[in-house]
Amino acid sequence: MSACVAIIAALPREVKALVKGWESSSPARNVRVWTKGNAVVACAGMGADRVRLAVQAAMAAKPVTTLISAGVAGACDPRLRVGDVVHVGTVVDARTGERFEDPEYTQVLVTGAEVAGVAEKRRLFAAYGASAVDMEAAAVARLARAHGLSFAAVKAISDGAEFEMKELGRFATVDGQFREMAFAGYVAVRPWMWGRLMALAKNSDAAIAALTKELEAQLDWYRQRG
C-alpha cells in the first residue's frame, strides 16, 4: 500500500496555509477535512475527545497509513523560542502516564487536558523534562496504536515558557472550538492585556508559518516514498 499520511490538527487556522487549494469537506459539525493526493488533513477542535472525530473523518476520506499530530504548542523548556519546531520523540499523557515513543527524536511533549499556564509549564518541565505541552497528541498516538498505524508528532512553539496563556481555556467550547468573539470582548475592556494579545497574535502567526513549512517538507518526503 502507498503511504498515505493524515495530519490531525485542532483548529483550521493552524493548517489554513498548508491546505490552500486542496479539496475540502465538512462531514460533521465543526469537523473539517482537506485532501490532496495521498494526504489528508483533518480538524475537529481542541482536546482528546475531538481527536477521535478528526481521525475518524481522515480515515473515512483516505486509506491512512500514518497519523501525524500537528499544531501549535506552548513551550515548557525555557530555551525554546516562538517559531521553534519540536520533533517529538516521546509523548506523555499527563492524565494516565502513558508514553508513546519515536526513537528517531528526543524531545518530550506532554499532553494535558486544558490550556497550560506558566506554573503548569514549569511543573511539566521539572517533572518530565518536557519541551512543550499540547492537548491532543496523546490521543492521536493512542488511536494510531489501536489502528496499527505509524505515528509522529510535530509542533511549533506559539508561546514561550514564561508567556501566560491560562485564561484562554475559559473560551473553549464543549466541542473544542475557540470563542474568538467572546475572547475579543473580554480583552477589549482590559487594556492591560492589549499588549499581550498583540504579542500572542504575532507569535501564533510565526508558529503557524514555521509549522506550515515543516509539514510541507514532511509531505514532500512521504510523496517521494510513494
Tell where the protein language model's regions lie, with residue ranges:
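Short N-terminal binding/cap micro-motifs at the start of the first secondary-structure element
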Residues: 14-18, 50
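Helix N-cap/beta->alpha junction signal
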Residues: 11-12, 137
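Short, aromatic/basic amphipathic alpha-helical patches
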Residues: 17-25
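Extreme N-terminal starter segment of soluble prokaryotic enzymes
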Residues: 1-6
